[in-house]
Each structure stands twice: as structure tokens, then as C-alpha cells.
């Protein structure tokens, strides 16, 4: 369910050494399955363990995951990285905003999952996002850009060289292309 790197495990053991005996960590998702999903890690004293928690054993500590968060933490990773600027704990949970869908799920669900878990997080760095409007009978994914992507001068490059290439590579034989139906209006909200 959750992979915690050796350096992150050592970091947690160090942090927990200053806590009361029996304290573990809790990994959770606030508003799981929504665009506002936020992941977090906190201390979990023994009296905060719930009967329906999943307990994951690591080297020197356990991690508790509540029942509601568990499916959204599939394939999550926690790492502790140190560089010239200092050290940082990172938690990546690709399924926090949307549960992973099976390979035999309908095409629209699989594309929506890729958009929410892979494409939109990349576009978010520019304040943008895309939404799947429909998939046409001839296999065209009809998309609408929003936020900073609406009116951006680079939207055609993003669409053809980025999004279309990624989706066609992931869904060969099912998708034939992508189409942008956004009425682009350049403004203060636009990235470039």
C-alpha cells in the first residue's frame, strides 16, 4: 500500500524517539477522491488507533491508515531527501484525488484517471488543468482547458506534443487523437 524509503524510515524512528512509548505515525488523506485531496502524516498515540485502521509494519515503527484513506493511498511513497537547501519529507500519493481504475474499466474512466493523476498535476504548476468532455465514436478525446491554460500561447504545443502523445501512447488502438474545444481567451489568468 505505502512504500517508505529507508531514509524516511530512519527519519520517523528519530522523530518517534522523542514521543511517548507506543506512538506510531498516521498517514491520511483529507477529502479523498476529490480535487481538493490533501495527504498528510502525523503522530498517532496508542489511544488514537481505531479498530478499522490498517497497521503497516516498518523498521522500528508502525504506520496507521484509516479505512477511508486506505484505497486512496495505494502506490503512495514517502521519502526523506537531503540536498544543498536542506532536508524534506515528501509524500506522493498518485491515487489521492481519484482511485486507481482497473485495466478493464471503461475507456472514459481510464482516461479520466490519467488526467487527474498524471496530467493535471503537471498543468497545475502553471495554474492550469484539463477536463475530459467526451470521447467521440471515432476515438477522439475531447478536452477543455481551464485555469492558466485557457488563453496560454503554448496551449497547442501542450495539447499535441504533451497530452495527445501521452494519451495515444497509453491507449493505443482505443484513442485516435485529442481535440481542444476551449474558447480560449487570453487574460491575466493565462500562463503566457
UniProtKB/Swiss-Prot annotation:
HAMAP family listed in its UniProt record: Fe_S_biogen_NfuA
Single Gene Ontology BP annotation: iron-sulfur cluster assembly
Cofactor(s) needed for function: [4Fe-4S] cluster
Binding site for [4Fe-4S] cluster: 149, 152
Pfam families for this protein: Fe-S_biosyn (PF01521), NifU (PF01106)
Domain of life per record: Bacteria
Function: Involved in iron-sulfur cluster biogenesis. Binds a 4Fe-4S cluster, can transfer this cluster to apoproteins, and thereby intervenes in the maturation of Fe/S proteins. Could also act as a scaffold/chaperone for damaged Fe/S proteins.
Protein name listed in UniProt: Fe/S biogenesis protein NfuA
TM ranges: none
GO MF terms held by the record: 4 iron, 4 sulfur cluster binding; iron ion binding
Sorted UniProt keywords: 4Fe-4S, Iron, Iron-sulfur, Metal-binding
Subunit structure: Homodimer.
Manner of cofactor binding, per the entry note: Binds 1 [4Fe-4S] cluster per subunit. The cluster is presumably bound at the interface of two monomers.
Family: Belongs to the NfuA family.
Amino acid at each position: 500500500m505505502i512504500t517508505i524509503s529507508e531514509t524516511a524510515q530512519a527519519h520517523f524512528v528519530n522523530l518517534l524517539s522523542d514521543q511517548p512509548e507506543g506512538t506510531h505515525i498516521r498517514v491520511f488523506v483529507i477529502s479523498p477522491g476529490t480535487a481538493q485531496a490533501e495527504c498528510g502524516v502525523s503522530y498517532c498515540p496508542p489511544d488514537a488507533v481505531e479498530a478499522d485502521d490498517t497497521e503497516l509494519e516498518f523498521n522500528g515503527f508502525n504506520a496507521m491508515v484509516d479505512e477511508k484513506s486506505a484505497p486512496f493511498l495505494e502506490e503512495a511513497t514517502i521519502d526523506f531527501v537531503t540536498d544543498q537547501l536542506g532536508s524534506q519529507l515528501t509524500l506522493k500519493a498518485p491515487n489521492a484525488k481519484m482511485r486507481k481504475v482497473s485495466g478493464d474499466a471503461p475507456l472514459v474512466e481510464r482516461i479520466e484517471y490519467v488526467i487527474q493523476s498524471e496530467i493535471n498535476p503537471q498543468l497545475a504548476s502553471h495554474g492550469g488543468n484539463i477536463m475530459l468532455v467526451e470521447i467521440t465514436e471515432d476515438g477522439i478525446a475531447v478536452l477543455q482547458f481551464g485555469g492558466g491554460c485557457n488563453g496560454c500561447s503554448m496551449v497547442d504545443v501542450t495539447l499535441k506534443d504533451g497530452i495527445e502523445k501521452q494519451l495515444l501512447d497509453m491507449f493505443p488502438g482505443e484513442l485516435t487523437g485529442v481535440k481542444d474545444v476551449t474558447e480560449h481567451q487570453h487574460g491575466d489568468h493565462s500562463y503566457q
